[in-house]
């Protein structure tokens, strides 16, 4: 039975077309795809229900926000449906009052990059319209505009994620920074840079959906961040 299941599924794991020089790598690509597609944990309890979920290393039986954006981009190489499901796991209904997005781990909004990847691959207006208001809610919390978020509580307007997780960009930050309490006054450049990229991605989606008022909001955010980042940066 297992052999039959494998034979039925193996066709969808065929390595993508490649130049002749890379043909020797085809098996490795197929094996990596197989690992990715079976890297699933169950059950994971979230939002009042049990789900199956892709998780880093098949070891952590929980959700991981920043990892899962990258996992979704990998899934898009094999299954756009699985990639969308991975994205949708972290998005909330536009009228949600409980949470702006599903958060665990570093405040790195990789779901916006996954959204852009899916739009580039599908050109689907339906996908754009479904995800846009959910990602807008995510964006507004990430930028201190929604749900009591404290990410933008400094006069500079630069973003600080420390109230939600101990590191900023998916790495372990300098211990001395935390030992000296620097996280009350310091903003990591990477957080505002991600905000800038998220604004640009949503601006493109808003343009596609004809949301001119939203486009203006993102354009103002992009202009302000371009100005305030170099003004307030220290080396």
Stretches found by the model and what they are:
Residues 1-4, 225-231:
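Conserved small/polar residues in nucleotide/adenosyl-binding loops
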Residues 2, 97-106, 143-220:
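The feature captures the catalytic groove of carbohydrate-active enzymes
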Residues 2-18:
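Mature N-terminal, pre-catalytic/accessory segment of carbohydrate-active enzymes
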Residues 13-129, 133-136, 187-189, 200:
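Substrate-binding groove/exosite segments of carbohydrate-active enzymes
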Residues 32, 135, 215-227:
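Short amphipathic alpha-helical coiled-coil/interface segments
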Residues 130, 134-149:
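Active-site cavity-forming subdomains of large catalytic enzyme subunits
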């Amino acid at each position: 039975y297992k052999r039959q299941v494998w034979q039925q599924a193996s066709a969808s794991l065929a390595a993508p077309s490649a130049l002749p020089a890379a043909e020797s790598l085809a098996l490795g690509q197929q094996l990596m795809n197989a690992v990715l597609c079976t890297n699933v944990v169950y059950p994971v309890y979230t939002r009042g229900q049990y789900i199956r979920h892709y998780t880093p290393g098949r070891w952590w039986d929980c959700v991981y926000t920043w990892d899962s954006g990258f996992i979704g981009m990998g899934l898009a190489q094999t299954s756009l449906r699985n990639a969308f499901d991975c994205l949708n796991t972290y998005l909330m209904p536009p009228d949600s009052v409980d949470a702006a997005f599903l958060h665990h781990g570093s405040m790195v909004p990789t779901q916006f990059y996954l959204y852009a990847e899916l739009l580039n691959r599908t050109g689907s207006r339906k996908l754009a319209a479904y995800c846009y208001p959910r990602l807008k809610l995510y964006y507004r919390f990430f930028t201190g505009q929604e749900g009591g978020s404290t990410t933008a509580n400094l006069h500079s307007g630069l973003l600080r994620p420390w109230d939600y997780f101990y590191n900023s960009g998916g790495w372990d930050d300098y211990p001395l920074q935390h030992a000296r309490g620097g996280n009350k006054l310091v903003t990591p450049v990477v957080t505002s840079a991600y905000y800038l990229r998220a604004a640009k991605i949503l601006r493109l989606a808003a343009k596609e959906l004809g949301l001119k008022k939203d486009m203006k909001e993102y354009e103002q955010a992009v202009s302000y961040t371009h100005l305030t980042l170099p003004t307030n940066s220290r080396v």
